[in-house]
Structure formats: structure tokens, C-alpha cells
Amino acid sequence: MKKHTLALGLISALFFSFQAHADLSRTSKGALLGAGVGLLSGNGVNGVLKGAAVGAGVGAVTEKGKDGKKARKGAKVGATLGAVAGVLTGNGLEGAIKGAVIGGAGGAIVGKMN
């Protein structure tokens, strides 16, 4: 129960801080939606944070224009590096898939910011 309360508080803080901005980017919307899905998954704060990261990555990739192009390029590099790291840890195909997802999301966020 304590984890769910903390996670709900984190989601509320994200939601109300984003409401201060009139125009939310796709990255922000993706992070907020991903955090909500992470909360519903029942993994507490860990699920919220992972959901927000993946959601922000997906949102960054779907951005239009120059930012979206940079995010897609970053996602390709991040997914490749993440998949290689996942295989090298000895987790086989499952590690490669998890590494590609997390690496791609992180690469998209970093790529958009550059």
C-alpha cells in the first residue's frame, strides 16, 4: 500500500507540474502516459519510473521536425548499444530485447535534447 501511495503521489506531482505548461510536447505526454501505465502495472515507484522513461522515449521519437529526426537517430544508436549490452550480460535474447527497449528510449530522449 505504501508503494502505491508513493507512486500515486509521484504521478500527481508529474501531472500537476505539466499542467503549468499550456502546450505539452509529445515527449511530456508520453512520459505522463507511460508513468500512468507503470502505476497500473502494480510495480510501484519502479514501474512508474520505467514507464515514464519508455513513454518519454516513444514520445520523443514521434515528435515532428528536427527534434523528431534527432530522436529517431538517437533511438537507433541507443537500441543497438542496449541490445549488445544485453547479450554481453549473458541474458541471451531476452536481455537483448530488454536492452534494446531501454537503450532505444534513452537514446531517443538524449538525441532529442542534442
From Swiss-Prot:
Q: Which InterPro entries match?
A: Gly-zipper_OmpA-like_dom, Gly-zipper_YMGG, UPF0757_YmgG
Pfam families found in the cross-reference section: Gly-zipper_OmpA, Gly-zipper_YMGG
Q: Which family does it belong to?
A: Belongs to the UPF0757 family.
Q: What is this protein called?
A: UPF0757 protein YmgG
Instruction: Write down the species.
Output: Escherichia fergusonii (strain ATCC 35469 / DSM 13698 / CCUG 18766 / IAM 14443 / JCM 21226 / LMG 7866 / NBRC 102419 / NCTC 12128 / CDC 0568-73)
